[in-house]
Amino acid sequence: MSDQQLAEAQEVARLTGRVAALEEQLSRMEAMLATRLDRIATRQEEIGSFLIKRANRIAEAQTLYLGDHTAMTFLETGHRIYVDTRSRDIGIHLMAGGRWETKYTKLFRGLVKRGATVLDVGANHGFYAIHAATLVGATGRVEAFEPNPRLAGLATASLRTNGFRWARLHQVAVGDAMGQAELTFNPAMSGGGSIRKPGGPAKEEVAAVEVVALDQLFPEESFTVDVIKMDVEGYEGRALRGMEAILRRSPDVKILMEFSPALLARGGVDAAAVAGFLQDLGFQPWSVDEDSRPQPARWETLTAKGAKTHNILVARSL
């Protein structure tokens, strides 16, 4: 082979190697580009799905007036809820944004697990009962209690329309013994109804209601509870005494409740006595901070003279 032929062969080999290197580089670039395009496509699908969900939420987040002071609206979870349009406290918040007591709701949802048993004592429109039913699922159980016949009817309809067969609404008040009482209430302030003995004067509407003690309603030793939400405008002390056996056999139960010395006194119960009752059962209180986190509280502070109303978490341990 002549020097010229050798030089040409070497040049061909060099160019061939260069072409092979370029082909390999292009192949890597093509693979990288394909990966990036796949990521972009996936991201576009995620964004599209998000926008569709948001659009559906906006489309559904309308309040439909049904007549007779009744509307159907949607919680922020997308679940339907029936509302008394006269309610200027709870009802108006539900119709405006599907939310109520946001930091308290966040804590409540964090406590309720799939398959749990939840009691909603003072269910009102059924807001917490709906949240509970969503979270416990078909393997769980929700027992809700609301003596106001109007609100009980709305809450029952809400649970039914969402298909929560494992959730039940009892149109009764919860106390320390079986019996009868009167519920006084103002439709404009649906969260403020209170129980009293029959026969007294009233400036508000009055309804005769049945009172039940939960220990008598659920006497089975196998019946235990995981979470209790309770807001009964000062009747909490009596309601707790009526479920003492349930509390004793539910070691891990968490209770979210309103604690108001003034309202408890109006219901004929001393706040310190309620605190003592819970302490004797091993319960300690926690307050709820702005980030929905429980912070240790003291019974002495909660029951002190002039103490305000607090939404608290009561448990044996967290």
Feature locations, PLM:
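Phosphate/nucleotide-binding beta-alpha loop and adjacent structural elements of enzyme active sites
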Residues: 2-318
